[in-house]
């Protein structure tokens, strides 16, 4: 259950984020990382893995099941989250595409939930994409390795340079 205070923080963020924001902070990796105690470079590595830093990215997920889902925006927020985001915070699918900053905040929130559930480890990061099911272990490991490779590459660079360029949608290799 999400605490009352967290709902207030998210509501205030949504109100403030509806105002136009500068290009330098358009994707809010640093701010979202601070809010959810996640390294902004890790968020950037996830965004690179998920969407190649494309805020308009939309993908259909079939994953071998009859039920398909949709991933949208920089952090490729999955449609399984849409009802909760809409009912609890008033965030629509269109908001996640139109507001890259909001998309990053939601992605950071989802990652923070994984970390809270399973600890600070690569399984939690892999679960961002593949979930915690035993059936998705192979996909989780592959995904975590992709994020890890981007993350290690980003750690070797100047942190502020990486964050500034990611905020402009520039992939850093």
Residue locations for each model-derived region?
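Bacterial N-terminal signal peptides
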Residues: 9-18
């Amino acid at each position: 259950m999400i605490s009352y205070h967290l709902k207030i923080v998210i509501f205030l963020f949504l109100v403030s984020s509806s105002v136009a924001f500068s290009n330098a902070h358009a994707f809010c990796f640093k701010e979202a990382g601070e809010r959810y105690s996640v390294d902004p470079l890790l968020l950037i590595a996830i965004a690179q893995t998920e969407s190649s830093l494309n805020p308009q990215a939309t993908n259909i997920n079939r994953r071998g099941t009859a039920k398909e889902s949709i991933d949208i925006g920089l952090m490729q927020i999955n449609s399984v989250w849409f009802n909760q985001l809409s009912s609890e915070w008033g965030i629509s699918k269109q908001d996640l595409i139109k507001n890259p900053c909001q998309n990053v905040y939601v992605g950071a929130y989802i990652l923070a939930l994984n970390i809270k559930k399973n600890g600070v480890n690569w399984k939690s990061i892999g679960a961002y994409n593949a979930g915690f099911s035993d059936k998705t272990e192979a996909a989780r490991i592959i995904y975590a390795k992709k994020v890890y490779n981007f993350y290690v590459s980003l750690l070797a660079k100047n942190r502020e340079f990486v964050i500034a360029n990611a905020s402009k949608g520039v992939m850093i290799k």
